[in-house]
């Protein structure tokens, strides 16, 4: 579902490339639990990494202008920001040149990396047009509880790590239910079973040491007319 984008001059553009994509031994899947406010990267049914996240503070679903986080089966359609520095601000998926530190007062833009999602089911078919992303946020103190405008927010450190571990087209499952038991056990063992206290930035994700896939573009994405939610 997610297109992989080329890296050029610190800006990602979707285009063809002659570089081959490395193939992992098993397909990876992203599972996002609204109840747990966590994202698990799974491979062959086992967790590779577990990260705290923040989903919508408004609702769940795919209704236009609702600021809801969509549920169901999706995939990564685009990867944007490959060479951007930590805290790089994006507007309309383009870097502005501004860089923000974590928890910059009064600021809530999209930062660091963008994984643009597209839906695969009737109930999330508007996801791409609604500009729903997995992305970095400077509001890292809100990670671990619902606080977004529909997107799935991560710390800058965590979104870079996830970005580097998956190719475009990676399957995503967003569910109201809890993470798989193996991922919950992983998180408990690594001390990531609870949300951070108010005003605190969550600890970095605990990840397994596995090879990271090379990114490869899979062609341009057709432009859509869409509504752009403020600071998802």
What are these regions (language model features)?
Residues 10-13:
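C-terminal motif of bacterial Sec signal peptides marking the signal peptidase cleavage site
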Residues 18-60:
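A structural motif detector for short, solvent-exposed N-terminal "entry" segments of globular domains
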Residues 29-33, 38-40, 50-52, 75-77, ...:
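Soluble periplasmic/extracytoplasmic beta-strand elements of cell-envelope proteins
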């Amino acid at each position: 579902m997610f297109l992989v984008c080329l890296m050029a001059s610190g800006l990602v553009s979707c285009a063809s490339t002659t570089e081959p994509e490395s193939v992992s031994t098993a397909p990876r899947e992203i599972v996002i639990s609204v109840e747990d406010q966590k994202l698990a990267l799974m491979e062959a049914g086992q967790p590779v990494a577990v990260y705290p996240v923040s989903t919508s503070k408004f609702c769940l679903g795919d209704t236009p202008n609702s600021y809801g986080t969509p549920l169901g089966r999706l995939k990564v359609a685009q990867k944007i920001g490959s060479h951007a520095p930590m805290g790089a601000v994006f507007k309309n998926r383009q870097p502005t040149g501004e860089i923000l530190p974590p928890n910059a007062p009064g600021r809530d833009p999209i930062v660091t990396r963008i994984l643009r999602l597209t839906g695969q089911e009737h109930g999330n078919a508007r996801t791409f047009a609604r500009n729903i992303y997995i992305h970095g946020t400077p509001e890292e103190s809100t990670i671990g509880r619902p606080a977004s405008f529909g997107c799935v927010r991560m710390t800058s450190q965590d979104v870079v790590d996830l970005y580097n571990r998956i190719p475009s087209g990676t399957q995503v499952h967003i569910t109201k239910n809890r993470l798989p038991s193996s991922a919950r056990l992983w998180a408990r063992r690594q001390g990531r079973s609870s949300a951070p206290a108010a005003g605190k930035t969550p600890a970095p994700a605990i990840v397994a040491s596995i090879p990271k896939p090379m990114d490869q573009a899979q062609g341009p994405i057709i432009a859509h007319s869409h509504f752009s939610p403020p600071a998802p």
